[in-house]
Amino acid sequence: MKINHVAIAVENVEDAAKTYQDALDIKNVEFETVESEGVKVAILHLENANIELLEPTNDSSPIRKFL
């Protein structure tokens, strides 16, 4: 079995990305906003998987319920 990614809901994607970058020595991070889903995303690229940090951008975002 292989894990492609793990998604984590966060209050602030920039702060959380910095924390994970520092803790895990991650160099490759990309950010995007998906307006249709109401979410800001940081994708932290690891050697064999990715960590996706998800920040809701509005109260109707499906990510909001996980915080």
PLM regions: where:
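Short acidic/glycine-enriched loop/turn segments that link adjacent beta-strands
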Residues: 36-40
